[in-house]
């Protein structure tokens, strides 16, 4: 998956854009969808919309200034971080356990110089009570949407 600003996007080059960041087979289906809130095209391979798209589509609806939205399916973390109306980070990570999820989220926040103690983290996936307790040690608030 890749997000390409509309000013650089050419539909005929969608496969090339994607091939620069992920390995795709020659016969893989490549799709793109315009995301007006970012003035960019979300490009992905396969017939199923990736969870990261849903994260990005919903990120702007969060009321907080520092927006942290995650989806974790037990294997992959989809993470979107925004500040105000700006998208700061959009990525996926292999995360087989919740400690790995925490690592990637906190690393991203550190690299963006955002203070988790002043931020609400939101998940679009269910969390165990133990996972929520762990999050409350680092974040001002935890929300499951």
Each language-model region and where it sits:
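Hydrophobic/aromatic-enriched cytosolic interaction surfaces used to assemble or bind macromolecules
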Residues: 1-145
């Amino acid at each position: 998956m890749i997000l390409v600003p509309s000013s650089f996007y050419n539909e005929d080059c969608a496969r090339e854009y994607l091939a620069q960041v992920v390995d795709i087979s020659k016969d893989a289906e490549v799709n793109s969808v315009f995301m007006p809130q970012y003035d960019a095209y979300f490009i992905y391979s396969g017939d199923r919309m990736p969870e990261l798209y849903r994260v990005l589509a919903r990120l702007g609806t969060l009321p907080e200034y520092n927006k942290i939205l995650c989806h974790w399916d037990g294997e992959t973390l989809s993470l979107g971080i925004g500040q105000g109306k700006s998208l700061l980070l959009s990525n996926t990570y292999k995360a087989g356990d919740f400690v790995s999820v925490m690592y990637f989220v906190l690393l991203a926040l550190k690299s963006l110089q955002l203070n988790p103690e002043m931020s609400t983290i939101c998940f679009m996936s269910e969390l165990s009570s133990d996972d929520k307790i762990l999050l409350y040690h680092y974040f001002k608030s935890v929300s499951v949407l």
